[in-house]
């Protein structure tokens, strides 16, 4: 009966002849260290995520993938922003190695403040490119003082009020123009000109008055003799 490897034992999974984790633990000498490293990576990447990352590469590269994942996880705990690459670039690789040794020995990773790296060793600038704070101000403008800010706010407020007054005056002019109706050019030859709104309404009601029931006054009143007087409003 074949004994399970230390990685499968700590993960409580079956181990067979084609085990994925067994070849990845050959560079670690101690059995406890192999179990500690596997358990740490399973907690960091997840059990299924760890196996998928290892199986994504060919067989001869899987031990290197396991080791790279271990160093990257320890580097992210020490420096969450830059990781192991940032620690190597800034000259703080010793802290990443100390974190790996602590994981192999089953000890917690201690957080130590990183020394201030020089500007040439910084991978990520203090302010990202989409942050406007990295743009230098023009010295001729004199900066953004409170007086300049108040002046700009007052100017914008006056422009807004002026535009509102203009819109209100245009709306009032449009409302007044609806009170006067102008007949088409064909009717202007009859001498009617302009009619007020009251005259137009009276002309609309005329057909209804003519179609009213006959009350017996048609014989006494002649419509042709009635004089109509039109006045311009």
Swiss-Prot record:
PROSITE patterns on file:
LOB (PS50891)
Which Pfam families did the record assign? LOB
Determine the domain of life of the protein's source.
Eukaryota
Q: Where is each LOB domain found?
A: 3-109
| Annotated family | Belongs to the LOB domain-containing protein family.
Name of the featured protein: LOB domain-containing protein 42
Q: Which organism is it from?
A: Arabidopsis thaliana
Q: What is the lineage of its organism?
A: Eukaryota, Viridiplantae, Streptophyta, Embryophyta, Tracheophyta
